[in-house]
A protein has these predicted regions:
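Short, C-terminally biased terminal segments at protein or domain edges
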Residues: 1-55, 59-156
Length: 156
């Protein structure tokens, strides 16, 4: 079994990265006057997902990691709201909205599954919230299947 040694190995972080690229490409269609408005808001929330996954991974407790995953999940809700606004303002079409919204749902499911896994791991394996300071030690394949295989992302 494999041990994940960095956040870059997490399937959920990889998908958050792909999603960020998708959002950046989508917001290129937004009017220039939105650069400091909706465009900035949705891209900052999108970057926040991967950033919180990465930051949480390097914390020294599963409890902290879960806290950062919950923040990442909140950013997904923020993006969903922003997608509705972009649709209402006709910055994106219905197809782009549906496709991107579906990706937010998938990413949210992955994060929820990962939170559930970390909580169950803590209950089943340790009363001590501290984890190895060098790496988080958990079975990669178990977590991979619990949080779902990487979504079939289409970028571009």
């Amino acid at each position: 079994m494999s041990t994940i040694k960095s956040f870059e190995e997490l399937p959920v972080w990889k998908d958050a990265r792909k999603f960020a690229n998708k959002i950046y490409n989508l917001t290129k269609k937004f009017p220039k006057e939105e650069n400091y408005g909706l465009t900035s808001q949705i891209t900052r929330a999108t970057v926040s997902i991967g950033s919180n996954i990465a930051e949480g991974f390097d914390r020294y407790s599963k409890k902290d990691f879960i806290k950062y995953l919950i923040i990442a999940r909140g950013s997904i809700s923020e993006i969903q709201n922003d997608l509705y606004i972009a649709l209402d303002l006709k910055y994106i079409n219905q197809n782009d909205f549906q496709e991107t919204y579906a990706l937010t749902k998938e990413l949210g499911k992955q994060i929820n599954g990962f939170i559930k896994y970390l909580r169950s791991y803590d209950k089943n394996n340790s009363k001590d919230d501290k984890v190895n300071e060098e790496y988080y030690k958990y079975d990669f394949w178990t977590s991979y299947f619990l949080i779902g295989k990487s979504a079939n992302w289409r970028i571009g």
